[in-house]
Structure formats: structure tokens, C-alpha cells
Regions:
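OB-fold and OB-like single-stranded nucleic-acid-recognition modules
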Residues: 18-128
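Sec-dependent N-terminal signal peptides
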Residues: 4-13
């Protein structure tokens, strides 16, 4: 009996350790484009719904209200932003692969800086 219980607990831990963290609805990962592809011509995606994939570079340490995908471009990293409390991204997500579906919008910068782009997601999946 004890061996069976331990086996069930071990199996549960293995499956839980590899489970993705999902915010919002399920994501169609087959439609995902790499964040670098979006950043080649971000204006062409403005106000459109897209699904992107990338590695998480950083996460908001105060309220978990944004995270940034690593991007090898002049515009990177690329920010994923939600209203405070809508989704709370865990600090442990840093370095993991993620997928996000949402609308690309302008992100106003300072007076002497060009505006950047960010994604307002309806769904996010932190995969590994």
C-alpha cells in the first residue's frame, strides 16, 4: 500500500513539474511567430492579434504585470503588458519559453526616444 501511494505521489510530481502555466484561453502554438520576426516590421502588426513565442528575459518584480521576451534586435527586448491584476506572471518564469496571443500596440517612450511596441495579451502560456 505504501509503495503504491509513493508511486502515485512521484508520478504526480513528475507530471506537475513539466506542466505549462496558462493564463487566459488555450494558445494555438502552430500559429506562433518568433518575437524576432515580429520585430523586423512591428508596424505591420500594429493593432492586430498575433501569437508570438520567445524566451522570457525579465518579469515585473512588483506586481507581475509585464514580462519581456528576449530579442536579438535593436528594438528588443519585447514587452508583454497586462493591466495590474489581470494576469500575474511569476518571477520563476525568467529564462523559460513562452507563447502569448494578443494585440500589438504602441508603447510611448520618453520625449527623446522613439515609441516602442508591446503586446497586450488575452492568453499566455509559459511552457517550460
Amino acid at each position: 500500500m505504501l509503495k503504491t501511494l509513493l508511486a502515485v505521489i512521484a508520478a504526480g510530481l513528475i507530471f506537475t513539474a513539466n506542466a505549462a502555466t496558462l493564463f487566459g484561453t488555450a494558445i494555438d502554438k502552430t500559429a506562433a511567430i518568433p518575437v524576432e520576426q515580429l520585430l523586423v516590421q512591428p508596424a505591420s502588426y500594429l493593432d492586430k492579434v498575433v501569437t508570438i513565442s520567445g524566451k522570457i528575459d525579465s518579469v515585473c518584480s512588483k506586481q507581475g504585470c509585464w514580462m519581456k521576451f528576449t530579442a536579438n534586435s535593436e528594438q528588443g527586448p519585447f514587452r508583454i503588458k497586462v493591466r495590474d491584476g489581470d494576469m500575474v506572471f511569476p518571477l520563476s518564469a525568467k529564462g523559460k519559453t513562452a507563447y502569448a496571443t494578443g494585440t500589438v500596440r504602441l508603447w510611448p517612450q520618453g520625449e527623446d526616444e522613439a515609441d516602442a511596441y508591446q503586446l497586450y495579451p488575452t492568453a499566455v502560456e509559459i511552457a517550460d
